[in-house]
Amino acid sequence: MFLSASTAGLAILGAQYWGKRDIKTLDDIFSMAIRICGIVSVLFFVACAFFPKYLMLIFTNEPVLIDYGVSYLRIAAFSYLLTGFSQCYIVMMKISEHAGSAAAVSSITVVLNILLNAIFIYGAFGIRSMNVRGAALATLIARIVELLLAVIFSYRPGFIRLKVHELFVRNKQLSKDFMKCSGPILGASLVWGIGFTSYSSFMGHLGTDAAAANSVAAVVRDIICCLSAGISSAAGIMVGNELGAGNLKRGKTYGIRLLKLSVVCGVIMTILMAVSAPVILYFVKLTPQAGVYLKQMFVVLALYI
């Protein structure tokens, strides 16, 4: 939530300055976002690395699930140190008209994560099965590769790259503008985040069947909602670029068209969510009771989408 709000502020404000072709200010915004994301990343790393059991108790009281969660978080915590930095780089690629490179980095990371999950969780190529710890290790390696690729891409001509000396320079006016963009998004994200965290916590305390069904439903929801996230990200950048360039009329036109497109996509995603339960149940192993929970969750999530 905190990282999403910070990178959203970077996208909104940065897109406008890219429209103006004000690279100096864009460098300052990039450094500011890196500082904020770095602080947030360290805080979450400390919480997950040193207090994983207390975090898991928020979501479940099942000893088995807590043990799995603790094993996962102690390794995955290191990936949280990198996530904020890599996401800032990827957002900078998007707003500076290098969305293809950003997509390439993200796609490589996702494919690598899937392959490593299969290898580490189940065991392959001489590597023993690591179960939950394998999933965490796969995530960590994928995040390392993602950040390395993002940094390497940033040194190509026409890309915005981090200037280390600017990390320690604070622009008060720019900080205020950044918080004006990020603050409302953070507030909205916190409200939604608290809601979904509470929801997950309730599911976890209902037992393993409910927790398993909720885990599957959350993954499917996130996959289907990727389209919505992509449209909203593109809308903010496209409109921001035009506003920064002074093309107010074109920016308004883009905004209206993308708003209409989002409504159509919302309907499509709702239908997909509503009809996908039988297909998902065919591919995952759940108890009969967990299957019932999953179908009910899909109905609720379809209405939410």
Predicted features by range, described:
Residues 56-63, 119-130, 190-223, 241-242, ...:
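Helix-terminus/linker motif at the lipid-water interface of multi-pass membrane proteins
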Residues 132, 136-139, 148-192:
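Interhelical loop/hinge segments that connect adjacent transmembrane helices in multipass membrane
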Residues 43-74, 268-295:
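Short membrane-interface helical motifs at transmembrane helix boundaries
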Residues 63-89, 220, 288-305:
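Alpha-helical transmembrane segments of multi-pass membrane proteins
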Residues 111-148, 277, 292:
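Membrane-interface helix-loop junctions in multi-pass transport and translocation proteins
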Residues 37, 76, 102, 106, ...:
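Residue-level signature of transmembrane alpha-helical cores of multipass secondary-active transporters
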Residues 1-45, 83-102, 200, 213-277:
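Small-residue-rich hydrophobic transmembrane alpha-helices
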Residues 4-7, 11, 76-95, 102-113, ...:
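Short runs within selected transmembrane alpha-helices of multi-pass transporters and secretion channels
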